[in-house]
Amino acid sequence: MAKILGIIGGGQLGLMLTEAAKKMPEHISEVIVLDPTQNCPASKAGAKEITADFKDEIAISELAEKCDIITYEIESGNSEVLKKLESKCTINPSPDTLKIIQDKLEQKKFLTKNNIQVAEFAEVNKLDE
């Protein structure tokens, strides 16, 4: 049975995801995007829209109610809200992953801990450091 795909972000990447999904009707029956811009690029490829801020808890919950799968094309999503909604639909990448990539210091620490090379970095907590 084909699934409904929700995408947080309807910009250029959302447009490309929508176009790709439309080529797989046996897997994806519909695409719904959440984006603050009405008539965002993804809507021009046939995605339905929920017009709201990327962090809007009510809008993200509405997206989860309407979709079987949620992904995102922008790091600005609300990882805490998505975490609460994991039982309602599949969310990939996971809200935990989103939380890590939203904080570049935490992202570098995570990558280093997992033996993935990153450029040298230093943690700075005050302006005089």
Each language-model region and where it sits:
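Active-site nucleotide/adenylate-binding loops and adjacent lid/helix of ATP-dependent enzymes
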Residues: 100-129
